[in-house]
Structures are given as structure tokens and as C-alpha cells.
From Swiss-Prot:
Keyword Transcription annotated: yes
Keywords, comma-separated and alphabetical: DNA-binding, Nucleus, Phosphoprotein, Transcription, Transcription regulation, Virulence
Keyword tRNA processing: no
Quaternary data: Interacts with hsp90.
One cellular component term from this protein's GO annotations in UniProt: nucleus
Protein name stated in the entry: Transcription factor rlmA
Family from the record: Belongs to the MEF2 family.
Length: 600
């Protein structure tokens, strides 16, 4: 029973057309693959669907195939629709493959219509000769041009780039992405995996080049940042933020120019610059090489130093105005530093660490900006918090310049004084080491003065400076510096296990051990002696949760129970019971299996 011959003409019904298209497209691709494998030839099939989607099959890299096509002379064999119009009596295989282009002919423009049938560009000449509507593909009839009208200048310039095959292929790539932005994922599968075999050097450029033109054409609302091409178009006030971190390492001075530009572009909103400028310098400090930070950190700061009262007056009326834009900028900054950005300014670790909790007169937005600024300056510079958040608008440049002379000396001393205060604690740690008794006394004095908590071990003095309830990972950058600067070094968290009650008993012996075994402090298993066993119980609550009563009561239990459970007899008894239980189910399933077999 032969298959019913269908009349080759345009299918009007959308459903039937889509089904036929899918089936015949699959058959065409399969035939192309078989032809490529059986005959060791390179086959490329490109289909421009009626839904503006691009379908393609290529036995090798599509760009390389198209590049080679340009160098070939006139095709040895060329067929178009007219070659098949009168030949409908051929065998079924040709029926299956060749009609596909003619089905698509009514749904798409003429050039794409025949493309699927053969190597994509062969029909190009045919259409240039016969179909007046296909005038665009004049440059060697490459089928990419008909798809998009805008980047035709590239098409015109393409012949000049024919000297290098790779450059030609790279030019074809962007246009392909231009014409059909939806299928890049499919293009990605077709292009990006294969190129690695052919020319890995050219392909990274090819992979990158399609995108910029795509956004250049589809996202024209972003002409300003030429190099910064964020994957999603955003309003123009924000791209400078994207652009700033990218250019900082190379062009530090443009950033300093950008920060005033942002302030001037939004003069009516006085407090928008407050958030914008702290944000830019923060990222500047991240990415600028160490030679430049002073240059850029200073210009924004003088703006923040002038009168606090005037800034407060302006913040009041402008709170409503700032609400739309600063949240967006804060979201950007929060992505850059997820740990330190506080949801509630009072609840942030840094707010407690630097004493930001009390000042409530300032608007919460400026405080959050301040907390973010200090989160970045945390490692090297700890500056008076209340001074920065209140940043009057940059337009009064004269005051900013006048303050600049003052700000440079004013701001730099505070970090020195703070760092001086911290080292004032550090020498105490150094003094503590030689004599154990003095070590105890100085530690307790230090910690009690800092937080009012009574601490016995010097290790606890350092966490307490961050307040007892503080989560430890965030302050680690600053606290780690303090710990490492002391002679006791980083092992403090690990090597100070004794609980508050037992530490007085074990103080001398334990400190001697600690001095010896500090480098191996990360291994609690070394402290398994009876005198030191309780140490982990104080170590965990102190380190993880801050010393509070319930924690110290709760945590020892998991520490004491698991070790006996594994070592004592009941553990083995339980294992034996489990083995017995395992045996009984094993016998059970066998019986059940036989029963099941008998049933079936």
C-alpha cells in the first residue's frame, strides 16, 4: 500500500501546517544528517519558520560552512522551486524532503522559503536573480541579510572583510542573532559547542560579538555606556552603576567624573546622590587598584562632611523623593555584598559593631547607605558612622571643595585613631602570652570594659567586642585582623575551649597547653583528656551563639551524648538488633517473592 500523494501547495490551516512543518523539518534534518554521515560531506540546513524562529542543522560549524560557501565559485548544482514544481512523481524520499521549502514559501519571505531544502546559500543566487523582493542578499546571497533590515551596513561592509575567513564568519554571527533574537539558545547549541573543535581562538569572539550588536539594535535607549552592556536594558540613571565597576580598574579618573555627573543629573533630588555616591566609591574601593583609592574615596567624602544640620533639613522633605530610586541602587549594592547589607539598619552586625544603633535622627535610608559604606571600609578604614550618611547634595561644589581640604585630614585621622585603639588592645594580648596569670587579668579587664560581660578566657574577649548576640561570620574580616595581630593568632576561636566555670580551675594548665598546641587548635580531638573534655561545650556556644545560659545548657548534650553512644555497649546492642531486624525482613521478602511468583 503506497502512501497517498499530497498536492504540494500552501497549507492554509495553521494546525495542519505546524504539524506538517514539524514532521518534515525533522525528516529533512534526519536526511541531512544521514547524507553527511554516509557520504562524508558537510551539510547545512537553515529554516526560517513562519513564527520568526530559526531552525538549523549543520554537520559541522555553521559559521565555518557559510564562510567556505563564500570562497566557492558558482555552485556545481543549483536547484530552486521551479526544479521541483513539475516533478511530483519522484520517489517518496524526495517527497518527504523537498516539499518542506515549498510549504514554507507562502508563510515566509521568498529567500528563506527554499533555504531548508539544500545548503542554505544555494537558493540565494536563485532568488537574487528571480525574486525582486530578495534584493538584500546581494552580498553573495547569504540568507542572513533578508532576515533583518537594520544592520545592512554590515552586510555592505562584509565583502571587505572577506580577506579573513574567521572575520567573515564572525560578521555573519551577529547578524544571525540580530534577525532572530528568540532562537539564540538554539544557535548557542549549534554554534558554541562545535567551534571549539575548529578554531577555538576565533570562537570566543564569535560568541561575544553576537550579543553587543543585538543589544545595540534592540536596546537603543542605552547609548551612553558604550562598553557596559548589561544583559537587561535598564533606565539610564542605573547603567552608570554597571559601568562604573567595569571601568574602575582601567579608568579611575572617569569614575571621579561620573560621580559628580550623577549628582548633577539629579539636582532636585538632594538625597539621591547621598545613596548614589556612597555606592560608587564603595565599588571603587573594591575594584580600583590600590594606587587610586585615595583619589576617589576623597571626592565623595567631602560632600558628606559639610553641615549635618543642613543635610537633616533637606533629608526631611526629600525622603519621599528618594524612595523610588535608592531602593534600586541598594538592590544592586546588596547583590554585590550580600552578607553585610542589613535589612534593618539597627539589626546589622556592623551597626552593632560600630555603634550605629543609637543615632536615630538620620533617615533610615542614609543610615543604610552608611552601613554599606562601612561594610566596605570595614577591613582597612573604620570611620565615624554618623558623619557619612548625612550627605548634602553635591551641587554646592564650593563647600565641597572647601571641605575637601578639611576632609582629607579630618577623615584620615579617625581610621588612625580607631586603628590605634584596636592595637591598644592588641598589645594587651601580646603581653598576656608570657605570663598566664596576667593573661587572665588583662583579658577580663578588656572584655568587661568593652561589653560589660564577665569573661575568663582571652578568646572570649574578642568575640565580646562584637557583642554577645552578634553572628560571627560577618565581623570576621575585621575581628580576624584583630585576632591574627595578637600573638595568640587565629587559633583563638578553636583553642579556647574551657567553660566559664571550669576555666578558673584549669586556667594555668590550660594556658600552658594552649601556648604549646595553638597551631593545632583546629583539632578538638587533641583535647580529649578529662580536664579538657568540657572545653568543647563552652567552645561551641561561645563561638556560634554567644555565651547565653540556654545555649551553654543545650549544647553540651550533643557533645557528651554522641561519644558515649558510639563507644558504649548499648550502641553495639542496637547494631545487633538492627542486624537481626535486617535478617528477618530478608527472609520475609523471599517468602513474599515466592508467593508472588506463585500468584503470577
Amino acid at each position: 500500500m503506497g502512501r497517498r500523494k499530497i498536492e504540494i501547495k500552501a497549507i492554509k490551516d495553521d494546525r495542519n501546517r505546524s504539524v506538517t512543518f514539524l514532521k518534515r523539518k525533522g525528516g529533512l534534518f534526519k536526511k541531512a544528517h544521514e547524507l553527511a554521515v554516509l557520504c562524508s560531506v558537510d551539510v547545512a540546513v537553515i529554516i526560517f519558520g513562519h513564527n520568526k524562529k530559526l531552525y538549523e542543522f549543520s554537520s559541522c560549524d555553521m559559521r565555518e560552512t557559510l564562510g567556505r560557501y563564500q570562497y566557492y565559485g558558482p555552485p556545481h548544482e543549483h536547484k530552486g522551486p521551479e526544479d521541483f514544481n513539475g516533478k511530483r512523481d519522484d520517489d517518496d524520499d524526495e517527497d518527504e524532503t523537498t516539499p518542506a521549502p515549498e510549504e514554507m514559501q507562502p508563510t515566509t519571505q521568498n529567500p528563506p522559503a527554499v533555504v531548508p531544502a539544500h545548503i542554505p546559500s544555494h537558493p540565494g543566487f536563485q532568488h537574487v536573480n528571480h525574486a525582486p523582493s530578495a534584493s538584500p542578499p546581494i552580498s553573495n546571497g547569504i540568507p542572513f541579510d533578508p532576515r533583518h533590515g537594520t544592520p545592512q551596513p554590515q552586510g555592505a561592509s562584509r565583502p571587505s572583510s572577506r580577506n579573513h575567513l574567521r572575520r567573515v564568519s564572525s560578521n555573519l554571527g551577529p547578524q544571525q542573532h540580530h534577525g532572530t533574537p528568540p532562537p539564540p539558545p538554539q544557535n548557542g547549541f549549534a554554534y558554541i559547542p562545535n567551534p571549539s573543535m575548529y578554531h577555538p581562538n576565533a570562537n570566543p569572539n564569535i560568541a561575544q560579538q553576537p550579543r553587543p550588536p543585538q543589544f545595540a539594535h534592540y536596546g537603543p535607549q542605552q547609548p551612553l555606556p558604550p562598553h557596559a552592556i548589561p544583559p537587561h536594558p535598564m533606565p539610564q540613571p542605573v547603567p552608570p552603576h554597571h559601568q562604573a565597576p567595569q571601568h574602575l580598574p582601567q579608568h579611575p579618573h572617569p569614575l571621579a567624573q561620573q560621580t559628580p555627573a550623577m549628582g548633577l543629573s539629579q539636582p532636585p533630588h538632594a538625597s539621591i546622590p547621598q545613596v548614589a555616591q556612597p555606592f560608587l566609591p564603595e565599588q571603587g574601593r573594591n575594584s580600583i587598584p590600590p594606587a587610586f583609592p585615595t583619589e576617589q574615596s576623597q571626592p565623595p567624602r567631602p560632600v558628606s562632611l559639610p553641615d549635618v544640620s543642613s543635610a537633616d533639613q533637606m533629608v526631611g522633605p526629600l525622603k519621599v523623593e528618594t524612595s523610588p530610586s535608592p531602593p534600586h541602587q541598594r538592590s544592586l549594592s546588596s547583590k554585590s555584598r550580600s552578607i553585610f547589607t542589613p535589612i534593618d539598619d539597627r539589626g546589622s552586625v556592623l551597626a552593632r559593631h560600630f555603634g550605629l544603633g543609637p543615632p536615630t535622627c538620620e533617615s533610615p535610608r542614609t543610615e543604610s547607605a552608611d552601613v554599606k559604606a562601612e561594610a566596605k571600609q570595614n577591613d582597612s578604614k573604620e570611620i565615624k558612622p554618623p558623619a557619612q550618611p548625612v550627605a548634602p547634595p553635591p551641587p554646592p561644589r564650593t563647600t565641597a571643595d572647601a571641605a575637601r581640604s578639611q576632609s582629607a585630614p579630618d577623615i584620615k585621622p579617625p581610621p588612625r585613631t580607631n586603628s590605634g585603639q584596636l592595637p591598644s588592645k592588641r598589645p594587651q594580648l601580646k603581653v598576656q602570652i608570657p605570663s598566664e596569670n596576667s593573661d587572665r587579668g588583662s583579658a577580663t579587664a578588656d572584655s568587661s570594659s568593652s561589653t560589660g560581660n564577665q569573661t575568663v578566657t582571652p578568646a572570649k574577649a574578642n568575640p565580646d567586642t562584637n557583642h554577645s548576640g552578634v553572628v560571627l561570620p560577618p565581623p570576621s574580616p575585621s575581628a580576624g585582623a584583630i585576632l591574627s595581630a595578637g600573638a595568640t593568632g587565629p587559633p583563638n576561636p578553636f583553642a579556647r575551649p574551657p567553660p566559664p566555670g571550669t576555666a578558673s580551675q584549669n586556667s594555668n594548665a590550660y594556658n600552658s597547653n594552649n601556648n604549646i598546641e595553638t597551631p593545632i587548635s583546629a583539632l578538638p580531638s587533641r583535647f580529649v583528656s578529662d580536664a579538657l573534655l568540657p572545653s568543647p561545650s563552652s567552645f561551641f556556644p561561645e563561638w556560634g551563639f554567644g555565651r547565653s545560659g540556654p545555649d551553654t545548657n543545650m549544647l553540651p548534650s550533643p557533645l557528651t551524648f554522641p561519644t558515649p553512644a558510639v563507644q558504649t555497649g548499648p550502641g553495639f546492642a542496637r547494631e545487633d538488633e538492627q542486624e537481626k531486624k535486617r535478617k528477618s525482613p530478608d527472609s520475609g521478602p523471599s517468602i513474599e517473592g515466592t508467593a508472588k511468583k506463585s500468584k503470577t
